[in-house]
């Protein structure tokens, strides 16, 4: 039975990764986690069906969204595109003291019923609520793996202890620790912060012990070339791609950025050449 479960996990992971072992995944959880103001730069993208259709047409390998958006726009994710459903989240409306906890929004079986190929959940490593999120993640992994579904951890070091000891959450030592902890808990894919250099991100990849590590895209870069350069460094460091939201949906026409990212991630193209080829420079 265990062998069959592992086959299911591997087959579903391949829905996100091309033969090169890399992936570009579009992230669409911002309306809940950050609020609809994230869509104000391009307001039509507040409609999930509008932006999902655009990114799927442009060639992303996967789409990540919360359960409610999967109900609304899941049909717009073509069968050849992987669907990742994140079942933990939080809002920015919470009191500050409670911002470092992710609550469970749905169960593994709910995501499966919505057509998920992978289940995602966040752990804020180092937060005062770390224990609760560890228990939550362990239960998700156990249940999903029993059914043959891969689990993605958004491994985000965060909290006052992290700030006090490391100075910033992107310090490679704590990002590396979070990635290793995610792998130790059974994650099949890890999304985490950029550490500032190829050399330090390579250590994060090494610490993950073979579990694919993808970049968390973060805030929109005003100069698209700057973001493409970061993604290039991630790939050169052994990273497996990127999960990108604002650097895509906060652009009036997201297609050139998506196609430039595909060039960098899947073809190892120089960022400047990729940007020029897609009219970003």
UniProtKB/Swiss-Prot annotation:
Q: Which Gene3D superfamilies match?
A: Aldolase class I (3.20.20.70)
Q: Entry's NCBIfam families?
A: Fbpase1_Arch, PRK07226.1
Q: Which reaction does it catalyse?
A: beta-D-fructose 1,6-bisphosphate = D-glyceraldehyde 3-phosphate + dihydroxyacetone phosphate
EC code: 4.1.2.13
* Assembly and binders: Homooctamer.
Task: Indicate how activity is controlled.
Answer: Activated by citrate.
What would be the name of the gene that encodes this protein? Answer: fba
> Which CDD domains does its entry note?
DhnA
- What this protein is called in its record is Fructose-bisphosphate aldolase class 1
In which broad location class does this protein mainly occur, judging by the first location in its UniProt entry?
Answer: cytoplasm
Q: Which UniProt keywords apply?
A: Cytoplasm, Glycolysis, Lyase, Schiff base
The cross-references to InterPro entries, in alphabetical order and at most eight, read: Aldolase_TIM (IPR013785), DeoC/FbaB/LacD_aldolase (IPR002915), DeoC/FbaB_aldolase (IPR050456), FBA_class_1 (IPR053414), FbaB-like (IPR041720)
Note whether Heme occurs among the keywords: no
Where it sits in the cell: the answer is: Cytoplasm
User: Can you provide one Gene Ontology molecular function annotated for this UniProt record?
Assistant: fructose-bisphosphate aldolase activity
GO CC field: cytoplasm
Record-stated family: Belongs to the DeoC/FbaB aldolase family.
In the UniProt record, does the keyword Cytoplasm occur?
yes
Task: Supply the source organism for this entry.
Answer: Pyrococcus abyssi (strain GE5 / Orsay)
Q: What Pfam families does its record include?
A: DeoC
Which GO biological process categories is it annotated with? glycolytic process
Q: Which residues form the active site?
A: 191 (schiff-base intermediate with dihydroxyacetone-p)
């Amino acid at each position: 039975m265990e062998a069959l479960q592992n086959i299911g996990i591997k087959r579903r992971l391949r829905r996100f990764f091309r033969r090169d072992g890399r992936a570009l995944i579009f992230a669409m959880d911002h309306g809940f986690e950050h609020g609809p103001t994230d869509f104000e730069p391009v307001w039509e993208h507040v409609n999930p069906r509008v932006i999902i259709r655009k990114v799927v047409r442009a060639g992303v390998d996967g789409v990540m969204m919360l359960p409610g958006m999967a109900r609304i726009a899941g049909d717009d994710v073509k069968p050849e595109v992987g669907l990742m459903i994140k079942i933990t989240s939080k809002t920015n409306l919470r009191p500050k003291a409670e911002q470092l906890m992710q609550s469970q929004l749905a169960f593994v079986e709910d995501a499966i019923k919505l057509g998920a190929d992978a289940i995602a959940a966040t752990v804020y490593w180092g937060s005062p609520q770390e224990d609760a999120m560890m228990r939550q993640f362990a239960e998700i992994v156990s249940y999903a793996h029993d059914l043959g579904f891969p689990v993605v951890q958004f491994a985000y070091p965060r909290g006052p202890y992290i700030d006090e000891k490391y100075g910033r959450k992107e310090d490679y030592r704590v990002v590396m620790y979070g990635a290793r902890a995610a792998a130790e808990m059974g994650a099949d894919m890890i999304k985490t912060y950029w550490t500032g250099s190829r050399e330090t991100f390579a250590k994060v990849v090494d610490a993950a012990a073979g579990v694919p590590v993808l970049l968390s895209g973060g805030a929109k870069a005003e100069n698209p070339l700057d973001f493409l350069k970061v993604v290039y460094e991630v790939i050169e460091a052994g990273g497996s791609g990127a999960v990108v939201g604002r650097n895509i949906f906060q652009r009036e026409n997201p297609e050139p950025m998506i196609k430039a990212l595909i060039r960098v991630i899947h073809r190892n193209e120089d960022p400047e050449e990729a940007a020029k080829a897609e009219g970003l420079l």
